[in-house]
């Protein structure tokens, strides 16, 4: 029996050109030039980058290839500090931080279904800097078994950070599982979400 051995560089079908992350993490953000050819951005001097990108973009890249890069490389994808989702579970508390800066509390629905929290956001078409856009997302997270579901809370900060949190109960106590909606309250101050 023949076994094909691949170099670790090509773990995915298309190697470094195949996406290795979720695409919808930044809801409608812009695109930077280094997102089009990220593997070159660290190897080329900044003095030549601008002209190289202009040459490549102006030299007739097919529309399909351009679209592929737009879809696969969202802004800040490689920077873990800019990840729009942070889930923290320590000894006393379970917290989800989710960047939803394009949504208002009225656009968000947060529900607890058994051992899961479901966060859904949707806004109808509205005008922004680039034209008209509508956005929608749906996230589902498993709650730890010892989270007190009767004390769950959810708030949206002034800078668009949704914070879902619940205290953990000591082992042996009933955490109380049921289906219910969690209201999203609005805070006037920016989020204190961790940066890493």
UniProtKB/Swiss-Prot annotation:
The modification N6-acetyllysine is found at residues 93, 122. Residues 76-185 form the sHSP domain. Residues 176-190 have a biased composition (Basic and acidic residues). It holds the Pfam family HSP20. The modification Phosphoserine is found at residues 45, 145. Zn(2+) 1 binds at residues 123, 125. Residues 168-196 are annotated as: Disordered. It comes from the Eukaryota. Residues 1-63 are annotated as: Required for complex formation with BFSP1 and BFSP2. GO terms for cellular component: cytoplasm; cytosol; nucleoplasm; nucleus; protein-containing complex. It is found in: Cytoplasm; Nucleus. This is Alpha-crystallin A chain. It comes from Mus musculus (Mouse).
């Amino acid at each position: 029996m023949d076994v094909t051995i691949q170099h670790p560089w090509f773990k995915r079908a298309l190697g470094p050109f195949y996406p290795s992350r979720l695409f919808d993490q930044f809801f409608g953000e812009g695109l930077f030039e280094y997102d089009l050819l990220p593997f070159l951005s660290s190897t080329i001097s900044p003095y030549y980058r601008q002209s190289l990108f202009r040459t490549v973009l102006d030299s007739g890249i097919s529309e399909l290839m351009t679209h592929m890069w737009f879809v696969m490389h969202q802004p800040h994808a490689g920077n873990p500090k800019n990840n729009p989702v942070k889930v923290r579970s320590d000894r006393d508390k379970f917290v989800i931080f989710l960047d939803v800066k394009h949504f208002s509390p009225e656009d968000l629905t947060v529900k607890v279904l058994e051992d899961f929290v479901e966060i859904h956001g949707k806004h109808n078409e509205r005008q922004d800097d680039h034209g008209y856009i509508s956005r929608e997302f749906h996230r589902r997270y498993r709650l730890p078994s010892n989270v007190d579901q009767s004390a769950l809370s959810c708030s949206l900060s002034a800078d668009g950070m949704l914070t879902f949190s619940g205290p953990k109960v000591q082992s042996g106590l009933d955490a109380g599982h049921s289906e219910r909606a969690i209201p999203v309250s609005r805070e006037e101050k920016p989020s204190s979400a961790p940066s890493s």
